[in-house]
Swiss-Prot record:
It is found in: Nucleus. GO terms for cellular component: nucleus. One of its GO terms (molecular function) is DNA binding. This is Mating-type protein A2. Belongs to the MATA2 family. Residues 210-239 are annotated as: Disordered. Residues 58-132 bind DNA. The lineage of its organism: Eukaryota, Fungi, Dikarya, Ascomycota, Saccharomycotina. Its main location: nucleus. There are three genetic loci for mating type genes in K.lactis. MAT is the expression locus that determines the mating type of the cell, whereas HML (containing HMLALPHA1, HMLALPHA2 and HMLALPHA3) and HMR (containing HMRA1 and HMRA2) represent silenced repositories of mating type information. The mating type is determined by the MAT locus, which contains either a copy of HML or of HMR. Diploid cells are usually heterozygous for the MAT locus. The keyword Acyltransferase does not apply. Keywords: Activator, DNA-binding, Nucleus, Transcription, Transcription regulation. Mating type proteins are sequence specific DNA-binding proteins that act as master switches in yeast differentiation by controlling gene expression in a cell type-specific fashion. Transcriptional activator that induces the transcription of a-specific genes. It comes from Kluyveromyces lactis (strain ATCC 8585 / CBS 2359 / DSM 70799 / NBRC 1267 / NRRL Y-1140 / WM37).
Length: 257
């Protein structure tokens, strides 16, 4: 399944205006979609020479599927980082995601397996989608390499799945799709200020309350000296944290690098 699920994407040629007569009525383009009736792969990638010779519009019809697969891969990687031994995966983290997922298939949890099965379903049914994102060669990497916060994964994934309502992907329930946990926002403690206790009066009171003594000055010097820069971690762990985690809870796309 790993081989069929995690294939690299290729480019496809869009039907030109000359072939408009052969397009079925069901696949006619609207304002937000691009018609792509011929589903056979040419097997040839576009080169600069062909683009210069022909100025007709080209598209990447699998962009819709690639976006969904990217969202799933990020969630799978986050799941692996949370629930599995970090040191065990550090040596293999810079390999393709397919190798990591195939090795963890037998020891993964049920919800992670449901992600893999849904990925396989998306791979087998990508050609059933009639609405595709237009592809611009100057911004070809922005769609697949764009960092997406985990809080945005669920709504974007559901909006993408609604496009292909006719495929077997729609048989999955919302409970199976909503596996991304909501991040609970920490409630900030607020204090009501009376007329007598304004921020300026509190600041003046604290400033008067602390007299300038030698003890306080010595303590402040000791505290300043004790604040030494943290020791840098090992090279592997540093690269690991920089590459796969950040403060914004963004997981980089490993597959389409």
């Amino acid at each position: 399944m790993a081989n069929s699920t995690l294939r690299r994407t290729t480019f496809f040629k869009l039907t030109t205006t000359e072939d408009e007569d052969t397009i079925p009525k069901l696949l006619q383009p609207n304002n937000n979609s691009v018609a792509f009736p011929n589903l056979k792969r040419t097997g040839k990638a576009f080169t600069n020479d062909t683009i210069k010779e022909n100025t007709k519009k080209y598209t990447r019809p699998r962009n819709q599927f690639v976006l969904m697969r990217t969202l799933f891969n990020r969630r799978v990687n986050n799941h692996i980082l949370q629930y599995y031994n970090k040191s065990k995966l550090e040596k293999k983290m810079f390999t393709l995601t397919s190798k990591i997922t195939s090795e963890l298939w037998n020891e993964s949890s049920p919800d992670l397996k449901s992600y893999f099965s849904l990925l396989a379903t998306l791979e087998e049914n990508w050609h059933k989608y009639t609405h595709y994102c237009s592809w611009d060669r100057n911004s070809a990497q922005t769609l697949s390499m764009e960092p997406i916060e985990l809080s945005q994964v669920r709504p974007r994934l559901i909006s993408s799945l609604t496009v292909g309502a006719g495929s077997s992907v729609s048989t999955y329930t919302l409970r199976e799709l909503l596996l991304v946990r909501k991040i609970k926002s920490r409630k900030r403690k607020t204090t009501t200020l009376t007329q007598d206790s304004s921020p300026t009066t509190k600041f003046k009171y604290k400033f008067k309350k602390q007299p300038k003594t030698k003890m306080n000055s010595n303590l402040s010097k000791l505290r300043f000296k004790s604040k030494q820069p943290p020791t840098p971690p090992e090279e592997n762990s540093n690269v690991f944290k920089k590459r796969y985690t950040s403060e914004n809870r963004i997981i980089e796309d490993l597959f389409l690098m």
